[in-house]
Amino acid sequence: MNVYKQVLFQNINKLLSLYNIDNFSNTYGYADREFWGWKIKDFSNATLQGGVHSLSIALKLNVFEGYQKEHILEVINSAILAVEKISAKNGSVVEAYPGENSFCVTALVAFDVLSAIKYLDNDLTVNQKDKYFDIIRPLVGFITKHGEEHAIISNHLATGVAAIALWNYLANDINSRDKELLQIIYDNKSDEGWYLEYEGADPGYQTLCTY
C-alpha cells in the first residue's frame, strides 16, 4: 500500500470520531468534539469541518473497512451542511475565539468543502451540489471582500488563492480575487526563494504555502 494511503487508512477512524452523527442533535455534523461533545468551549472550531476533504479522498481510494459507503457520504453531507450553521452573517468562520472573522480558516473550509465536491462529483446529485455551492458562496464572498489583517502570511493568502481558483473552476465563476492574492504573495517573496510568513522565512509554513 502507498505510504500516504497507509497513513490515511490508519487515521480514518480518528477522523470519523470527530463528527457528531446523532441526527437528532442540534449540532449534527459538527466536527469539534470540545464544543458539541465535551462542551468545554462556547464556539465550534470550523477548521475541523475541513475533514470532509480527507474523507472524500479516502472514499475515492476505498480505504474504509467495515463502513457502508452511504454512511460515509452522510457524514460528509452533515458536516458540509453544518458549515452553514457555524458561519457568521458576513460569511466568515472562526477557529480560536468567537467573532474572529478568520480569513485563513474561512478560506481553508471553503477549499476543503470544494475539494470534497470535486472528488465526490459522481456521487452527488445536482441538488446537493447546488446546496453545497450555496453554503460556500458566502465564505468565498468573505475572502473576496476581506484580507488577512494580521500580517503578510503567505500560506494564508495561498489558501485563499486555492479556494477561489477551485470555486471558479467548479462553480463556473470569474472571481479575480485569486490573482490579487497571488500577486501579494509574489510581491513579498524573497530573492532567496522563500515566501514571507509574518516577518521572515518559515520552512513549515512554506511547505503549506507551496502545497
Question: Model regions: which residues?
Answer:
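Low-complexity, Ser/Thr/Pro/Gly-enriched N-terminal "stalk/linker" regions
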Residues: 1-47, 70, 74-85
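Aromatic-lined, polymer-binding surfaces characteristic
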Residues: 40-211
